[in-house]
Amino acid sequence: MADYVYGLLHGVDEKKRIIAIKVNKKVTFYYMAKGMFQSFMQYFKSGIYVFMDVQETSRRYRGYTVKNVLNIEKVMSPHRQNPTIYYDVSIIKSGISHIMNTKKPKLFLDFEMSMPPYRNYEDFVSEIIQVGFILTDATGEIIDKQSYFIKTFLFKEISDRTKKFLRVEQEQIDSGLEYREFYDLFTKLLQTYKPMVLVWGQNDRIELKKMNFRHQLADFTPNTQFVDLLKLHKTYFNLKNDLGLFNAYFLYYENDIDKQKHDALEDARVTKAVFDGFLEVCNNLRMLSLNTTNELLGRRENQNETEE
């Protein structure tokens, strides 16, 4: 459980990452994790008010009785009718909600990459070997979905590790598209629909950029709107660590599909499902907070440990 606390900043112990808040003439102390403290330290000046979620229970820490800070909601300085807002998570969430509700076609994209061999992998360079995407119109209706295998360029044969992990055979790669063929199909799709491209993490955009450079093709990624759903989740829920795609799916549907196929189209489908769940959160149709996120992920970890 968490408590909501707000009050005037009374003092800061930078070495111990503790802030003191004064409420009704009473001073209480709160401990912040290193990353959080570094992010907000610039705002901790005299006259600042801090609004935050903290742990319900107290503990002793290096001479203080403290509660751990879970999340900072707002940092402001009152100036009569015109307070100065230094940080407000509600404004940030509003911006994320605006992105999520943008009325334009959306392309949910995922790649599978070649993997290095078990030995002699020093000169190995990964390549896109499978593409999966789902295209929706501005209303969210699916208008296309495709899956392609892509022929490798630098290493003609995929490694045994790739075959085992992705459950793919060399024949499937050999019968796939040349990257230039995929490039033509993909750029035509982008020009036709001008979609928002939704990915989980930054790797897909980075790998596309590398492949375009490797094949001496014009790089379209700077002029394409890529939206990283992982980054939006970390910002919206104030997550300290990266969240895996299938953990995110579990948050919304509590259905464990960890035994994934390692298939690009399947991962694109999961990305779309996560988008749909997150959109409901942004539009207040589903309740999900930092606390419930941690609780659900903890439950999933316990289930997996029990199964093992």
Stretches found by the model and what they are:
Residues 1-104:
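N-terminal accessory regions of nucleic-acid-interacting proteins
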Residues 101-105, 113-205:
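Conserved non-catalytic scaffold segment of RNase H-like nuclease domains
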Residues 106-110, 227:
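Short hydrophobic beta-strand that contains or immediately precedes a catalytic carboxylate
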Residues 111-115, 231, 270:
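Short, glycine/acidic-enriched loop or turn micro-motifs at the edges of active sites
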Residues 150-165, 173, 231-268:
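Active-site-proximal helix-loop-helix substrate-binding element of RNase H-like nuclease domains
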Residues 205-224:
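Substrate-recognition/cap helix-loop segment adjacent to the acidic, metal-dependent catalytic center
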Residues 221-233:
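Conserved beta-strand -> loop -> alpha-helix junction used to position metal-binding or nucleic-acid-contacting
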Residues 273-308:
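Acidic two-metal-ion nuclease catalytic site recognized across multiple nuclease folds
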